[in-house]
UniProtKB/Swiss-Prot annotation:
Stimuli inducing this protein: In roots by phosphate starvation.
Molecular-function annotations in GO: phosphate transmembrane transporter activity; symporter activity
Entry keyword set: Membrane, Phosphate transport, Symport, Transmembrane, Transmembrane helix, Transport
NCBIfam families the UniProt entry points to: 2A0109
SUPFAM superfamilies registered for this protein in UniProt: MFS general substrate transporter
Function per UniProt: High-affinity transporter for external inorganic phosphate.
Extracellular side: 46-70, 121-131, 183-211, 314-348, 393-402, 463-484
Organism: Arabidopsis thaliana
Coiled coil feature spans: none
GO cellular component entries: chloroplast; membrane
UniProt protein name: Probable inorganic phosphate transporter 1-2
GO biological process, any: cellular response to phosphate starvation
Amino acid sequence: MAEQQLGVLKALDVAKTQLYHFTAIVIAGMGFFTDAYDLFCVSLVTKLLGRIYYFNPESAKPGSLPPHVAAAVNGVALCGTLSGQLFFGWLGDKLGRKKVYGLTLIMMILCSVASGLSFGNEAKGVMTTLCFFRFWLGFGIGGDYPLSATIMSEYANKKTRGAFIAAVFAMQGVGILAGGFVALAVSSIFDKKFPAPTYAVNRALSTPPQVDYIWRIIVMFGALPAALTYYWRMKMPETARYTALVAKNIKQATADMSKVLQTDIELEERVEDDVKDPRQNYGLFSKEFLRRHGLHLLGTTSTWFLLDIAFYSQNLFQKDIFSAIGWIPKAATMNATHEVFRIARAQTLIALCSTVPGYWFTVAFIDTIGRFKIQLNGFFMMTVFMFAIAFPYNHWIKPENRIGFVVMYSLTFFFANFGPNATTFIVPAEIFPARLRSTCHGISAAAGKAGAIIGAFGFLYAAQNQDKAKVDAGYPPGIGVKNSLIVLGVLNFIGMLFTFLVPEPKGKSLEELSGEAEVSHDEK
């Protein structure tokens, strides 16, 4: 049976790149577009939420979210994502990739819309319902990580597998960029329709009641691309590797792949479903798994964990860093819509110049340079640029040096995406056995989200000024932006060291990497 299985799958490994591969990239990629849009668009509207729901007419500064509310709004979706990665990763191996794949998209669509419809008679009610729906939004997003990566890896040929998985993940960059463009468009329209004075001129009128629609429209827009691809996602057949290696139905796998690849794949009549090699039936918590893949799983979880502390803290709190260096004007000198526009413009510029190009550089070079070198170099360059920003921080905050700061800051994002942010997603979908692939990817991704939660909650407090008089309302003094950036640089360096635990999958079949090809070799 092993030879038949590998014979069927060899057709996938050597298949020429064709239309169906690109169709799969678009179908899976649109899920990731929505993932990134929904996770990161909240950073564009948190200051607006503070102005609307926590306005204090006696304060010289516009309203801001209290520390616990800001932490919840920024972090609750990440908590949901972590849970979803573990649950749907496990379910994808138990029930099959296709059966679970549509469910994650439905959750993302419904909860995106529901988040924008958050309600309540007072601020607490609105924030509570928003956090509730964003948790379940994150739960659906979490399922998309292991399923999209696993499906794309199992459909791809071995020559361009890395580029295909990276292309799916690169849609995350497009989603981040789209969030910025949507926020720019919506805030511009509302500014023309409902002009308002700055906060310094008139505190109450600086936030017209109509701006409450701005954040709701921005949040709900993420449901649109996901809804457009739902039909096509449900039409995708189960992956041949799951059908053959896990469900043990070679005949069905062959039929599915013949349709997908538009070619005839020969199948011998001898199908011995009852033949099982005990060496290939070890479980996740077995000694055999520990021996074969224990260090690999440690490598994928640790590097993703360390990377996401830095990546998410930087992404979610760009607005705070830009405000600290003076690239975004002081809040009191703007009205509510102007502030959304300025934050969106800054984040869009970073995404356009560094985040998005980084993703596509990975797509272009991953199957020539290899995953290991890209990840190692990415962590190294992130460390270098983070320290280059942090140690002379007082130099960068001078008005004449702000452009230099933005360039250096952009380069850390470029090498995150042409580096570990992409490779930590790709490698776990390649190196584990088919029956545990989705589960192990989910575990690796969940470790990453644990890091993201630390980044989201920790950086919020850590980046506060060391001077009590300069901290944001409700926060204790922190270690400051400079020291926070130094900590992130150290974490990037540690991530570089843990990269040595991760194998290089370039040019190898999934069965070679997972050890599932060993039975065939032994039988010969």
